[in-house]
């Protein structure tokens, strides 16, 4: 059994089966619905979150994992003689990374990786870390490789509305107003650890999702086709099925993995959001 323990935060949005496969401990961010504080993925689900928004007209608020919470988790494994590799949502998007770094500085044998990404973009790194642990690589080598790999991540998604990003302080009011007025579905791309607006799509959500996927995958020869995530917030299952079918048609991925966006990600992207997240070739 390896003496390396992988941990990550709840924004990685991987299915429970993958966390179990690689023996990953997930540390939950917090989501506030009014005065009630919930733990992402532990005592609240995305459908429950959007039911609250619909009933109250209030948007959820998210908060980072505290330094103390990280110390508790990291310290538990260090006391067992393990080395911890922790993978975080981008430091540009949450204070979770900085809090994890501060906790790691209080302990020995804890490595904190800033994914410079979000959702299953970070999740890709969790899987790669798990595979390298299984291969018997040492922690320093794994961390160095993860820091190289994260530069090749291609993460983006298409939104029904910019309202959630705007009110969460992740998008300018002007951009939100323009997209709303023109009934555009904006594409958000992860770049340099943050988020920027890419293309804008017109028409129904289904048409926009399929146009977005063509734009990301069609005709490209720089894609690492080992694995792609199709990650989405609650939306029409028929649209998701058509999206997955189109992904398989456009590129010969060995694995196409559908995942549900967790409550932290949903709090900022809203319902009817879908993204494709993959590595580019080395």
Regions found by a protein language model. Name each.
Residues 3-5, 11-21, 25, 30, ...:
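Mixed-charge interfacial surface used for oligomerization/domain docking
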Residues 37-106:
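Class I S-adenosyl-L-methionine
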Residues 64, 115-116:
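Short beta->alpha junction loops
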């Amino acid at each position: 059994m390896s003496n390396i323990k992988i941990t990550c935060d709840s924004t990685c949005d991987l299915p429970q089966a993958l966390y179990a496969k690689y023996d990953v401990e997930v540390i939950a961010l917090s989501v506030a619905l009014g005065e009630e504080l919930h733990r992402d993925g532990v005592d609240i689900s995305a459908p429950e979150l959007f039911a609250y928004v619909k009933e109250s007209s209030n948007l959820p608020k998210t908060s980072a994992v505290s330094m103390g919470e990280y110390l508790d988790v990291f310290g538990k494994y260090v006391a067992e003689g393990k080395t911890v590799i922790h993978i975080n949502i981008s430091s540009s998007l949450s204070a979770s990374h900085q809090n994890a770094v501060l906790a790691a500085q209080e302990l020995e044998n804890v490595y904190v990786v800033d994914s410079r990404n979000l959702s299953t973009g970070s999740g890709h790194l969790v899987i790669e870390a798990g595979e390298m642990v299984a291969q018997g690589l040492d922690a320093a080598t794994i961390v160095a490789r993860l820091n190289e790999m994260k530069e090749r991540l291609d993460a983006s998604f298409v939104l029904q509305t910019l309202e959630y990003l705007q009110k969460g302080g992740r998008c300018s009011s002007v951009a939100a107003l323009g997209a709303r007025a023109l009934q555009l579905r904006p594409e958000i791309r992860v770049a340099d650890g943050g988020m920027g607006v890419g293309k804008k799509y017109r028409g129904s959500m289904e048409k926009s999702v399929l146009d977005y996927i063509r734009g990301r995958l069609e005709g490209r020869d720089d894609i690492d086709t080992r694995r792609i995530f199709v990650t989405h917030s609650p939306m029409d299952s028929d649209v998701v099925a058509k999206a997955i079918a189109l992904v398989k048609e456009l590129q010969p991925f060995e694995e196409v993995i559908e995942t549900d966006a967790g409550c932290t990600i949903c709090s900022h992207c809203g319902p009817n959001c879908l993204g494709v997240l993959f590595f580019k070739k080395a």
